[in-house]
Amino acid sequence: MVTVKNILFDKDASESSKYLGNLPEWDLNDLYTNTQSPELEADLNWLEKECKLFADEFQGKLVDLSASEFLDCVKRNEKISNVSGRLISYAGLRYYQCTTDGERTKFLSDIQEKITIYSSSLIFFNLELNRLPDKHLDELYPQNEELSRYKPVFDKIRALQPYQLSDELEKLLHDMGVVGDA
């Protein structure tokens, strides 16, 4: 196991600093082997393309989807979320191992920016989902048992409906995430 010296004062990483001892370093290989790994690049490329495809295929069309098509849409959105989560988890955990490392800070910032840009085309999903009449969703659930398992997720999203802003403001707030994280 690789260990990292735990420094009392993060701003002074010199050998003369007082150490609290050695701490274990996270093994992030289950996520990605390194910042240049082909898997990481493949996930970033896939995410960029899939976000665009998802928006092209489903934006403005949720109300017209059959139960099985709606399930496909939800599963694709879920996969996008999982890949995004994997990317940001790797970048974040790597950064938190050594917050004074400029390269790690830049890598985290770059990943955050890419995910924010790629996912901006997905803002429509929750907004459209919240515009669907309750009756519409209630009619879809009995048609597809697997889709009905997502009802608690939809209920949680729809509970925020009273606080939903216009599409333009929601997109602006999403895009401000890049600036806010800088």
Language-model-detected regions and their locations in the chain:
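A well-structured
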Residues: 1-182
